[in-house]
Curated annotation (Swiss-Prot):
GO terms for molecular function: structural constituent of ribosome. Gene3D superfamilies: Ribosomal protein L33. The gene is rpmG. The keyword Ribosomal protein applies. This is Large ribosomal subunit protein bL33.
Amino acid sequence: MAKGKENRIVITLECTEAKKEGKTVSRYTTTKNKKNTTERLLLKKYNPNLQRHTIHKEIK
């Protein structure tokens, strides 16, 4: 049995700039270690709908 697997959770990252512009949002799924990273993630990812890199924020 693997030890410590319960610390990793699957999260969804959603584009914040597309929401403001009223366009289709882009979403990414990834994992994070909730023990080491307790606050919500903010990452710069590519949004294919806007065709540029934008800030993606962790949602529930």
